[in-house]
């Protein structure tokens, strides 16, 4: 150039023409490029990538929608000189994809200008949450009023400002240069981008909010920017911004230009907001307008896997916490509060968002002034360190913990207590389940239609499913489990604790599974806790109210099950304290169940050992009493008593030993049979009982008459006190009354004194009578004979026990238990075998008592022997008849499901009512009660599980619809309606069994099924969830469930202590009290869940 100039004017002229020529070409070329670019940008579908980016912004658009137009105008109206720092910062997030620069440039454009304005105008802007886009927003608004106002504000001007700082530097420089990139983009197509961005970006900018603007200022410095980027790192956004493939940035930009800026700048402030909005507000709108399945997918441009949605999701969770905490030290507490509020705004709770937005402006503005106030990354406090001055609060959301950690907890906690409390909403982004909405199919009726009365259909369907679940369990599932136990040769006790408990608790187990994996709620926990309280209070209380007599409970089965239940409840309460269930906690609960099953395997041995330990003190007491009168003979008698006890205890174990297996087919009449074949089962049981009692009363009348005739008038009163002490421990065993028919007064006294527990009374009474008679009146020879006879009797009883056990496997142990508990004059089988020896022993005792040692005693003894033998023969006949009846009942219970048309009209109506349930089951599931179908028990087992799962899903779904219509949560539905519905079949069975005299089986079964629910029904879904999601903990936070579990624990202690204080008997007053306590529990639980009252024991 210089040479040409020197050469001369002509050459100089030629040179000038050349320069003009090239300038014109460049100008024309630039115009063509600008024009074509403008046209492409103007057409929404011109660039698919741009359109996608715009659509991704739509969620942000919703965010802008949150702010009133006035607020937005305020933001734009208060023009603030764009700070270069701000512009640069904003640009940083925007600088992204080179190819999409044009598209992004518009967004960037807007963003940069927004930051500038934000710096000064943030106070006003903050109100809108879109303050960053204040001036820019205005322009955007003008460009595209349809789009969020903020976006409309976008102007190329902002891009120019950014251009000033524009530097095409690698992402590493992004902090400083990224604004430049943004400017570049702005230069290219500010207005076109403005439009699109106007539609989508505005909301993005709004989403970014003043917080973003503030952050950009903070990020103006490289260090500040770094902090911003770190924030993005925490969330996938950071990754996008820093890693930033330009695409990533672009994608982020496109999807949420403000979002990225926001996150980078405002410590994820806007990002949370964006997320919140996305979750609450934009999902419908944004998605619709964007016409993209996932607006976040745009962000995903850079990160398809972690599209904007992903980023938003992660950021929201993290940023939520972060934003809450992000405040500048420089800013006053008020600022901090405002900042937090702003964060809250973006948070998924819309309530906070409005107020937060208002407060945020001031804070953001101040922060803008202080560029070093870059929020620290949620996960990386290091960023905080960099901007120590201003990075005051950065909520660090750890991936596992749900709790947010704040540098300055005082402000954060005071401002946002709920956010800091452990709740699924604050869970780290890594947790896949943030309790989204339940995965239910669309309902035929809207909420308004249901409230007009159509909800009645849902209520009816829910009740109908309760019946269906009971039929599936009773008719197919439990029989299939019975076949499995036979094949595996599992003992009755273990089967009752495992398979039979599973049969009765299957609905609760599947409800828990549905609650964890489908409805994403605590409905399973509520159902299991509510069912536990229902079983303990309502079922046991109803049994005692409707039983024909006071329930005398065997203490060992109840003590054993309640001990395990208390241990399991304590574990559950401890695990609930942090509102997260880790995988190892679920495993511990399962191991507790395995320990329970192991204990049931050795139940008889443990029971014998425990009772032997407990029996030493009462026996010593008897020894002392006897030693006072007859020291010499007392020791012999006591040794004999202990031997007899060891031999006799096993025969008593049959009662209640498998008490957890209330679902045994020998005991349980299925719901279908009850509804069709015995519409009034309680009445039939009552009639049968009355017949039995009449025959027993006749026998009892004959006995006293015979005794009165044979007894001499002169009875020795001195011997009576000793005799009354002896039977004292007899309270629980009615079988003792049979062996000592005339000793009912003594039994009453024994119950009142209650010196010794349970079964010990029987042997103690007999032993002491022998002591008395042998020591005082009998010659030694007679005493030896008596001892031998007694030993034979015990051996015979032992044999009877073996026989009873065998029968228990084939026909159920109920016969033996019936004999002992009903008072049918003796233990059923042992009576037959030891009738003669038994009679002789008693005749000897009574003869000695009556005759003293006189000569007339022998004749009287002979007469008594004859009379008692006759009575016992009659008793044996009655017992045989009862056994036959019970066998018939068992056969009836074992009959396969029949679809025969019933006779009466009432039964026909019930048949038609149940046909929609029974007919599909009859078609699809083999009935293992038919011999030819027994080999298909595996198909029955699997088929019934599928039906139970389907019915449980319908039950939970319709319960959710009913709760949604009425306005109550799924947790409350589980605690109340679902818990009662799944437990009603057990309630009916328990009442029938209790009226038959097997009260302790009904009571112990209620506790046993609860053990299965807590140690299998709850931890199995939790463990599966953790295994599927990489051993992540399961969130179980709920307002009232923790307190409900504590209440359940207290109720259990009350029930057991009350029963024990009443000598293991349950009267009607105690039953009525438990009945009322159940309703008190329901009222308190509902009030806790609805936050009407606060839980005093919550952590």
Curated annotation (Swiss-Prot):
Pfam families associated with the record: Na_Ca_ex (PF01699)
Reported tissue expression: Expressed in the retina, particularly in the inner segment, outer and inner nuclear layers, and ganglion cell layer.
Transmembrane segment boundaries: 453-473, 498-518, 523-543, 564-584, 586-606, 908-928, 936-956, 972-992, 1011-1031, 1040-1060, 1069-1089
Disease: Night blindness, congenital stationary, 1D: An autosomal recessive form of congenital stationary night blindness, a non-progressive retinal disorder characterized by impaired night vision. CSNB1D is characterized by a Riggs type of electroretinogram (proportionally reduced a- and b-waves). Patients have visual acuity within the normal range and no symptoms of myopia and/or nystagmus.
Record membrane topology: Multi-pass membrane protein
Name of the protein in its database record: Sodium/potassium/calcium exchanger 1
Residues the record lists as Phosphoserine modifications: 658
Record topological domains on the Extracellular side: 1-452, 519-522, 585, 929-935, 993-1010, 1061-1068
GO function term, MF aspect, one: calcium, potassium:sodium antiporter activity
Residues with PTM Phosphothreonine: 724
Organism of derivation: Homo sapiens (Human)
Primary location recorded for the protein, binned into one broad class: membrane
């Amino acid at each position: 150039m210089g040479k040409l100039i020197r050469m001369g004017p002509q050459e100089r002229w030629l040179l000038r023409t050349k320069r003009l020529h090239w300038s014109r070409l460049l100008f024309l070329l630039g115009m063509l490029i600008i024009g074509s670019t403008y046209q492409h940008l103007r057409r929404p579908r011109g660039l698919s990538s741009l359109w996608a980016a715009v659509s991704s912004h739509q969620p942000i658009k919703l965010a802008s929608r949150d702010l009133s137009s006035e607020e937005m105008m305020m933001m734009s109206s208060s023009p603030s000189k764009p700070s270069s720092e701000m512009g640069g910062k904003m640009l940083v997030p925007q600088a992204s994809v080179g190819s999409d620069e044009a598209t992004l440039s518009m967004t960037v454009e807007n963003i940069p200008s927004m930051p500038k304005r934000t710096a000064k105008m943030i106070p006003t802007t903050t109100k809108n949450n879109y303050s960053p886009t204040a001036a820019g927003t205005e322009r955007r608004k003008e460009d595209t009023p349809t789009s969020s106002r903020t976006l409309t504000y976008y102007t190329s001007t902002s891009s120019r400002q950014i251009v000033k700082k524009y530097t095409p530097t690698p992402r590493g420089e992004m902090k400083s240069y990224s604004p430049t990139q943004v400017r570049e983009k702005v230069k290219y197509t500010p207005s076109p981008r403005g439009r699109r961005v106007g539609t989508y970006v505005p909301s993005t900018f709004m989403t970014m909010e003043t917080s973003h603007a503030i952050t950009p200022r903070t990020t103006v410095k490289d260090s500040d920017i770094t902090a911003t980027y770190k924030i993005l790192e925490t969330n996938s956004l950071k990754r996008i911004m820093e890693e930033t493939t330009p695409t990533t940035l672009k994608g982020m930009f496109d999807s949420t230009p403000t979002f990225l800026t926001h996150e980078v700048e405002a410590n994820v402030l806007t990002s949370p907001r964006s997320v919140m909005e996305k979750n609450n507000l934009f999902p419908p709108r944004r998605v619709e307008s964007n016409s993209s399945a996932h607006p976040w997918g745009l962000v995903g441009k850079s990160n398809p896997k972690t599209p904007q949605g992903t980023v938003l999701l992660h950021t929201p969770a993290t940023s939520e916490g972060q934003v809450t905490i992000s405040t500048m030290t420089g800013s006053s507490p008020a600022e901090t509060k405002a900042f937090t509020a702003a964060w809250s705004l973006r948070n998924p709770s819309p309530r906070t968002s409005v107020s937060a937005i208002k407060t945020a402006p001031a804070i953001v503005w101040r922060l803008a002034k202080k560029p070093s106030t870059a929020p620290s990354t949620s996960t990386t406090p290091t960023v905080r360190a960099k901007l120590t001055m201003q990075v005051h609060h950065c909520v660090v959301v750890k991936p596992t913990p749900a709790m947010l950690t704040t540098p300055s907890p005082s402000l954060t906690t005071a401002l946002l207590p709920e956010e800091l409390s452990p709740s699924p909403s604050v869970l780290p982004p890594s947790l896949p389940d943030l309790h989204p909405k339940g995965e239910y199919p669309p309902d035929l009726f809207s909420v308004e239609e249901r409230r007009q009365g159509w909800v009645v259909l849902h209520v009816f369907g829910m009740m109908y499913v309760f019946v269906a679940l009971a039929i599936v369990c009773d008719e197919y599932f439990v029989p299939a489990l019975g076949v499995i136990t036979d094949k595996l040769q599992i003992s009755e006790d273990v089967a009752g604790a495992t398979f039979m408990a599973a049969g009765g608790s299957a609905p609760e187990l599947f409800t828990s599974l549905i609650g964890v994996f489908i409805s994403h709620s605590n409905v399973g926990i509520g159902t299991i806790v509510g069912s536990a309280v229902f079983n303990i209070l309502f079922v046991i209380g109803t049994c005692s109210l409707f039983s024909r007599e006071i329930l005398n409970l065997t203490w060992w089965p109840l003590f054993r099950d309640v001990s395990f239940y208390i241990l399991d409840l304590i574990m559950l309460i401890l695990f609930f304290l942090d509102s997260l269930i880790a995988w190892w906690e679920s495993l511990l609960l399962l191991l507790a169940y395995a320990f329970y099953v192991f204990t049931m395997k050795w139940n008889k041995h443990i029971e014998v050992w425990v009772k032997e330990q407990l029996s030493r003190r009462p026996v010593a007491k008897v020894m002392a009493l006897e030693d006072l009168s007859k020291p010499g003979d007392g020791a012999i008698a006591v040794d004999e008593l202990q031997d007899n006890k060891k031999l006799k205890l096993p025969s008593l174990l049959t009662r209640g030993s498998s008490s957890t297996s209330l679902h045994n087919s020998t005991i349980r009449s299925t719901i279908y049979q009850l509804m069709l074949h015995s519409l009034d089962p309680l009445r039939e049981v009552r009639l049968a009982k009355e017949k039995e009692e009449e025959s027993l009363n006749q026998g009892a009348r004959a006995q006293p008459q015979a005794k009165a005739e044979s007894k001499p008038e002169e009875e020795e009163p001195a011997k009576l006190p000793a005799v009354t002490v002896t039977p004292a421990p007899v309270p629980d065993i009615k079988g003792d009354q049979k062996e000592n028919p005339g000793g009912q007064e003594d039994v009453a006294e024994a119950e009142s004194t209650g010196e010794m527990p349970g079964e010990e009374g029987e042997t103690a009474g007999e032993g002491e009578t022998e002591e008395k008679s042998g020591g005082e009146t009998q010659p030694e020879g007679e005493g030896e004979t008596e001892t031998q006879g007694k030993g034979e009797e015990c051996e015979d009883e032992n044999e009877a026990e073996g026989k009873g056990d065998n029968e228990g496997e084939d026909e159920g142990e109920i016969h033996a238990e019936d004999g002992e508990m009903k008072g049918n004059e003796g233990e059923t089988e042992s009576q037959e075998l030891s009738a003669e020896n038994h009679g002789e022993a008693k005749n000897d005792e009574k003869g000695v008592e009556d005759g003293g040692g006189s000569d007339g005693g022998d004749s009287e003894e002979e007469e008594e022997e004859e009379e008692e033998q006759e009575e016992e023969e009659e008793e044996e006949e009655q017992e045989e008849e009862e056994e036959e009846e019970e066998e018939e009942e068992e056969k009836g219970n074992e009959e396969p499901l029949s679809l025969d048309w019933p006779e009466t009209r009432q039964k026909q109506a019930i048949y038609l009512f149940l046909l929609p349930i029974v007919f599909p089951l009859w078609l699809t599931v083999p009935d293992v009660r038919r011999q030819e179908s027994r080999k298909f028990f595996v198909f029955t087992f699997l088929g019934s599980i599928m039906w139970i799962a389907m019915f449980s899903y319908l039950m939970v779904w319709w319960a959710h619809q009913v709760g949604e219509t009425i306005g109550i949560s799924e947790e409350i539905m589980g605690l109340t309606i679902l818990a009662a519905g799944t437990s009603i079949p057990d309630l009916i069975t328990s009442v029938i069994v209790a009226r038959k005299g097997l009260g302790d089986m009904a009571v112990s079964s209620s506790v046993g099924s609860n053990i299965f629910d807590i140690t299998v029904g709850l931890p199995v879904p939790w463990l599966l969830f953790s295994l599927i999601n990489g051993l992540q903990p399961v969130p179980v936070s709920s307002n009232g469930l923790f307190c409900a579990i504590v209440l359940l624990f207290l109720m259990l202690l009350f029930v057991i202590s009350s029963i024990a204080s009443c000598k293991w008997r349950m009267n009607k007053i105690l039953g009525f009290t438990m009945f009322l306590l159940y309703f008190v529990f329901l009222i308190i639980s509902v009030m806790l869940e609805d936050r009407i009252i606060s839980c005093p024991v919550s952590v």
